[in-house]
């Protein structure tokens, strides 16, 4: 069985991880891209990203997952971090209610700096620590319904729902972007119109296809 080389893909999607420090963003990244988990995760200086390709509807989707790498401690995340992002995983720790309370602030920052049509998923991480749960699932679900977000609970430690979370958000992005491409081909004068349009890159607005350039 032949595998496509890493640079052979149909779409490149930038997805950002945001949320309070210590909620498990780096481990979600490493679990999805390398199937690794570290109990001694240390904040990285600068911005870290990793990539992984998946198949959606017969297309190769290369996900470029960005991690804040500790910047959130200083509230120093810049607009450059969000630029070009078509998806965001907003992560909190189910055992620490303060990390859930801060979700609203993160959501506001995301909506202030990112494209208005970015796909957002709320992720309640550390579901393996059910005995220490401080945020009820129903409360988080109600928040997501109110804000129009998708929702999932994960455990990077046990690898529970990590794959599902990334597959779900990347599939949703793909369906929106591919619909945009079809719409623009069917009705060229209306390019850029419609509620579900995601602008991948203002200079190369081509639905995120590789030949239009990287979308970061």
UniProtKB/Swiss-Prot annotation:
Organism: Chlamydomonas reinhardtii (Chlamydomonas smithii)
Motif (Effector region): 41-49
InterPro entries given in the database record: P-loop_NTPase, Rab_GTPases_membrane_traffic, Small_GTP-bd, Small_GTPase
SUPFAM superfamilies (UniProt xref): P-loop containing nucleoside triphosphate hydrolases (SSF52540)
Binding annotation for GTP: 19-26, 67-71, 125-128
Major subcellular site: membrane
Membrane topology: Lipid-anchor
MF GO annotations: GTP binding; GTPase activity
Localization: Cell membrane
Lipid-modified residues, S-geranylgeranyl cysteine kind: 214-215
This protein's GO CC annotations: plasma membrane
Name of the protein in its database record: Ras-related protein YPTC6
Keywords, in A-Z order: Cell membrane, GTP-binding, Lipoprotein, Membrane, Nucleotide-binding, Prenylation
Family statement drawn from the similarity comment of this UniProt entry: Belongs to the small GTPase superfamily. Rab family.
PANTHER family, per the entry: DRAB11-RELATED
